[in-house]
Amino acid sequence: MSPDPIRRKGRKTLAKVYDSLTDPEEAADRSRIIGLPTKKEARDIRDELTAAAWAAGKTVSRIQTAKEYISIAESFFRKLRAIKNTETRTPQTGIPSLRELLRDTRVTNLDERERMIETARADTAILLVGGKDLRGEGARILLILNETRLKMGKTTILLAHGTEKDHKAVLPAYKPKFYRR
């Protein structure tokens, strides 16, 4: 039984996203940026879409905001770099590979790695995105996450709140449909 239709200005957009979470034929358009609601509206929409995805029997990433994902990713790779730089390099061992570093207990015991993997593997990732998340390093991290998920055939929904100018930097490289209210 599907929940009540979403009643708000952007309901056509949200209905389309809801359909793509439940209907296999609608799943071709896997990634999208939804904008431009207020932050509070974006939170409400995220909760509705999360409930819709769960109702459709999909796993949903527990990371709730793009800012949180970006900080986890930055922290994780910062630690990887620090370990790589401090490792002793001998002619026999050479420079440690990424695979070796991922086995390192200083990295693999971190909750961040589990949460990054969970976000990459969940059927549906719904991230609340602020303007700062779509500029510079944050935009790059989100693009990499999206490309990884697209290759796996997974749905990524970025709920962008703020002003349209905040999204111009990421949109040309991004290529999903950009839904306006």
Locations of regions flagged by a protein language model:
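Glycine- and charge-rich intrinsically disordered segments
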Residues: 1-5, 82-98
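A short, basic N-terminal segment
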Residues: 1-31, 55-56, 176
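Well-ordered, non-membrane alpha-helical segments in soluble/globular domains
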Residues: 11-17, 45-47, 109, 142
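Hydrophobic, Leu/Ile/Phe/Ala-enriched alpha-helical segments that form helix-helix packing faces
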Residues: 18-25, 49-53, 80, 84, ...
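Residue-level preference for the first positions of well-ordered beta-strands
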Residues: 29-35, 93, 124, 155-157
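Walker A/P-loop
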Residues: 32-67, 71-86, 92
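Conserved beta-strand segments of the P-loop GTPase G domain that flank and frequently precede/overlap
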Residues: 34-35, 63-64, 127-130, 157-161
